[in-house]
Swiss-Prot record:
Domain notes: The jacalin-type lectin domain has strong affinity for high-mannose glycans with terminal non-reducing ends of Man(alpha-1,2)Man or Man(alpha-1,3)Man.
Organism annotation: Danio rerio (Zebrafish)
GO molecular function, one term: identical protein binding
GO biological process, one term: defense response to bacterium
InterPro entries associated with the record: Aerolysin-like_pore-former (IPR053280), Jacalin-like_lectin_dom (IPR001229), Jacalin-like_lectin_dom_sf (IPR036404)
Gene designation per UniProt: aep1
Keywords, in A-Z order: Cell membrane, Lectin, Membrane
Subcellular location: Cell membrane
Cellular component aspect of the GO annotation: plasma membrane; pore complex
Subunit structure: Homodimer in soluble form. Forms an octameric pore-like structure in the membrane.
CDD domains linked: Jacalin_like (cd09302), PFM_Dln1-like (cd20221)
Reported function: Pore-forming protein which might play a role in host defense. Exists as an antiparallel dimer in solution. Can also assemble into an octameric pore-like structure spanning the cell membrane. Oligomerization may be triggered by binding of the jacalin-type lectin domain to high-mannose cell-surface proteoglycans, and also requires a low pH environment. In vitro, shows high binding affinity for S.cerevisiae mannan and human HIV virus glycoprotein gp120.
Name used for this protein in its record: Aerolysin-like protein
Limits of the Jacalin-type lectin domain: 4-143
Length: 315
């Protein structure tokens, strides 16, 4: 049986069990404080990227601190027991940003070092047992990752959304027909449009993994009653995506005899800022999958089709 996470615990069997991880929401270890005693690790306080923090053991005296930056992962981790099989004795790790941390008991010497498998290096939090001290503890890691996809994306408030569309004139031209025969005039125009889409995600996660999004993107269309919102077909996008293209239009305008026709060519631009819900599916290289529900904010810019308006007047 393969698992998406890796956890090895070092120390004794006393105390009460604790588990403080982002296993259910992808949150990672953001900051850690460690208090040490003569023959044990006294206490640990951990912060996760979802805003939670907890303290285990009983702090005493000064502490050592390590703060992780977004995208900072473990490259190595070693743990020691206290040599008597009753407590955690030391924590030592290095990161991909050149960071180093070493907290150890102060009176008893270190004996057996236990190097840990850090997997992808992305630390989901800590698990162990504690009471007045840290009896035992380990760090939970996400195993090496093959792919990360945001899927099952929904926009719960989209049906309540009243589209705000800014209409931009691309071209304005007039044709006069002073003859007694109907004339046809060709009109051509083009407009460079930049469509954008982004789905918010915690900085620690999006800085570490390349996330694909499998989703339909909100689109805007002009209808007889104004504007309506629809979804494009579900396809694969990056977490932040920009699509640049030239929208072109070629049309023929009929100008009746003794008439003037004013032609106005416009396009509508809509900005979206709305909540989304979805599922993050992390597939590890060992074939296992970690999946959890998530939510965030979608921001995007979409355009309507180019529209041609004509106004006919007598000469």
């Amino acid at each position: 049986m393969t698992y998406p996470t890796n956890l090895e615990i070092i120390g004794g069997q006393g105390g009460s069990s604790f588990s403080f991880t982002g296993e259910n929401n992808g949150a990672s270890l953001e900051k850690i404080w460690v208090w040490v005693g003569g023959w044990q690790i006294k206490a640990v306080r951990a912060w996760l990227s979802d805003g939670r923090d907890e303290t285990f053991g009983v702090p005493s005296g000064s502490h050592q601190e390590y703060v992780f930056t977004p995208g900072e992962c473990f490259t190595s981790l070693s743990l020691w027991g206290n040599g008597a099989g009753t407590r955690l004795g030391a924590i030592k790790f290095k990161t991909n940003k050149g960071g180093e941390f070493f907290a150890h008991m102060t009176s008893w010497g270190l004996k057996t070092e236990y190097p840990m498998d850090v997997g992808s290096g992305y630390c989901l939090g800590i698990v162990g047992r504690g009471g007045s001290d840290i009896d035992c503890m380990g760090f939970m890691f996400l195993n090496a990752v093959q792919s990360t996809v945001l899927t099952n994306v929904n926009y719960p408030t989209i049906n309540q959304l009243i589209p705000k569309v800014a209409t931009e004139e691309i071209k304005s031209v007039s044709f006069e027909n002073k003859t007694s025969v109907k004339q046809e005039q060709k009109v051509e125009t083009s407009k460079k449009v930049i469509k954008t889409s982004s789905w918010s995600m915690t900085k620690s996660f999006s800085s570490t993994f390349s996330v694909e999004v499998s989703a339909g993107i909100p689109e805007i269309a002009e209808v007889s009653t104004g504007f309506s919102i629809s979804f494009g077909v579900e396809s694969t996008h990056s977490l932040e995506q920009t699509d640049e293209k030239n929208e072109t239009l070629t049309t023929t305008v009929e100008v009746p005899p003794k008439k003037k026709v004013d032609v106005h060519i416009t396009i509508g631009r809509a900005s979206f800022d709305l909540p989304y819900t979805g599922t993050v599916k992390i597939t590890c290289k060992n074939g296992s999958v970690l999946q959890y529900e998530t939510k965030g904010q979608y921001k995007g810019v979409a355009y309507t089709d180019i529209k041609v308006n004509t106004v006919e007047k007598d000469l």
